[in-house]
Amino acid sequence: MGLAIQLIVEGDFAPNAVQPLDFGKLMVVKGKSKNVAVSLLNLGSKLSSIDYTIALDGKAGAEQHLDFGKDFGVGGTHTVEIPFAADSKIGTSTVTLTVTKVNGVENANATKTATGTLYTVERELVKRSVVEEGTGTDCGYCPRGHVAMHNMHNLYGDQFIGIALHQRSSTDPMYNNSYYLGFRSFPQCMINRSNGFCDPYDEMPAVLKASLNEIALAEVTVAGTFADEDTKVNATASVESLVAGDYDIAFMLTADGLTGTTTSWKQHNYFCKGHSGNPYKSKSSMPEDIQFLWDKGSSYYETYDNV
């Protein structure tokens, strides 16, 4: 017995209707402009161009035209780049985008505006992100986390601030229980203490890339020297903020190149040939950057960084 369902939707349908969606924070250097990704919810039958105005703190500028060079067709949410100019003064402004026309005719949608916060600054700071990774020597899947952290350091340089938190077991010679982020499995990581946890190998690269596209409102420059007794580090920090606000500073001292000769320093490895926990059936089926683990054995001596 067959079953068929027919759905018929009736009603007035505006062919030229767009709702812009709020676009968050943007930073523009004084005297310049920047293209900003804005999402447009198309409620009409086609979408090939818009006319719009941009208002700063309620004062609208001249109407502008943007041709997309193609028709997006019926419905859908589409992301386009719209140029936003800096304010004439340094500081924070409320910016409002109003889509006045769609395909050359008046925008028929009831909601025509979207808002964001514009930071007009003297110069744009380099965005850096902190990646805190939960790991451990007795974690057989953690070698891929080490690889991911290494890859991101090579890709982004000092824009990537990696911290390897050995918290899985107190038998780990690098065990750190001075603060707890609540990792539910290992390896796992958190970026800028926001957006929850993610897998360092499968998910972290994309989340990190997105975080580095966010605006930086402050810059911290750090310098450190060993004290005479070599058991303490004297550190100084300089902070430059582009906008006024209340800020807290947290710091951590990390080390690279840690090694040991006892068995507790050995890194467990489930990606080796023949291990029952290895999700890969052959070396050639593994991603190229972790193929070396196939031949490492079930545990191996590692050099640990960012600890």
Regions found by a protein language model. Name each.
Residues G76-I82, E288:
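Short strand-edge motifs at loop-to-beta-strand transitions and within beta-strands
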